[in-house]
Amino acid sequence: MKKSLTVTVSSVLAFLALNNAAHAQQHGTQVKTPVQHNYVSNVQAQTQSPTTYTVVAGDSLYKIALEHHLTLNQLYSYNPGVTPLIFPGDVISLVPQNKVKQTKAVKSPVRKASQAKKVVKQPVQQASKKVVVKQAPKQAVTKTVNVAYKPAQVQKSVPTVPVAHNYNKSVANRGNLYAYGNCTYYAFDRRAQLGRSIGSLWGNANNWNYAAKVAGFKVDKTPEVGAIFQTAAGPYGHVGVVESVNPNGTITVSEMNYAGFNVKSSRTILNPGKYNYIH
């Protein structure tokens, strides 16, 4: 009985084995499918390998070649013109590429750097030119100071000595009969002090030019020390005495009633040619 049972169990096991084998043959495509799927995935992974690499900080050509299973010679041949000095942002080809395109891709950062240097140098040159231009105003200021210094020398006056002239004149001198405090009153007294008396009845100042000529006094447009300067301007005219003739063409005079009634004053006349002078 034991042997019969053993045979029976063996038969059952053999039957199951044959049944599984037959079942596997009927569904053979399902068994092979995972193998085929893995093969296709490997092919796709190989075809999607990167063709370029962008340099980051810390990279070197040797490191890039090592990480992508290349030699340095291959990397140099794929990137004509590349040098060991690379910068972040440079694009390195990992496969053979057109030489012209790769040359432009590698060298363009270098050209930009050289252009940047030119741009930096230009402001420096312009700044140096501006410094040179600023020197001109300094010279102009120096010349102005020298010119402004000259008028101070011209303002020096040389004192003159009164010169007495003898003319054929008829002086009706009855003392100072002119109104007190007026310009005519002072001119009469000042001429008497200088020893060059004038008439007592010449009237208002605007008439002295005519009266002096009638009396025989020389009257002209040339000032001299001691001469009476006369003008008919104003309602009554005005007279005074020339105290000095200055080298710059001006004259210094003394007078009364110019700065106020009965006030004696002196001033410099810049345009002496507009007055008459009684010598």
From Swiss-Prot:
<feature type="signal peptide">
    <location>
        <begin position="1"/>
        <end position="24"/>
    </location>
</feature>
<protein>
    <recommendedName>
        <fullName>Probable autolysin LDP</fullName>
        <ecNumber>3.5.1.28</ecNumber>
    </recommendedName>
</protein>
<keyword id="KW-0081">Bacteriolytic enzyme</keyword>
<keyword id="KW-0929">Antimicrobial</keyword>
<keyword id="KW-0961">Cell wall biogenesis/degradation</keyword>
<dbReference type="Pfam" id="PF05257">
    <property type="entry name" value="CHAP"/>
</dbReference>
<dbReference type="GO" id="GO:0008745">
    <property type="term" value="F:N-acetylmuramoyl-L-alanine amidase activity"/>
</dbReference>
<dbReference type="GO" id="GO:0042742">
    <property type="term" value="P:defense response to bacterium"/>
</dbReference>
<dbReference type="InterPro" id="IPR036779">
    <property type="entry name" value="LysM_dom_sf"/>
</dbReference>
<dbReference type="InterPro" id="IPR038765">
    <property type="entry name" value="Papain-like_cys_pep_sf"/>
</dbReference>
<dbReference type="Pfam" id="PF01476">
    <property type="entry name" value="LysM"/>
</dbReference>
<dbReference type="GO" id="GO:0071555">
    <property type="term" value="P:cell wall organization"/>
</dbReference>
<keyword id="KW-0732">Signal</keyword>
<dbReference type="InterPro" id="IPR007921">
    <property type="entry name" value="CHAP_dom"/>
</dbReference>
<keyword id="KW-0378">Hydrolase</keyword>
<feature type="domain" description="Peptidase C51">
    <location>
        <begin position="158"/>
        <end position="279"/>
    </location>
</feature>
<feature type="domain" description="LysM">
    <location>
        <begin position="51"/>
        <end position="94"/>
    </location>
</feature>
<dbReference type="InterPro" id="IPR018392">
    <property type="entry name" value="LysM_dom"/>
</dbReference>
<dbReference type="GO" id="GO:0008932">
    <property type="term" value="F:lytic endotransglycosylase activity"/>
</dbReference>
<dbReference type="GO" id="GO:0031640">
    <property type="term" value="P:killing of cells of another organism"/>
</dbReference>
<comment type="function">
    <text>Has weak lytic activity toward S.aureus cells.</text>
</comment>
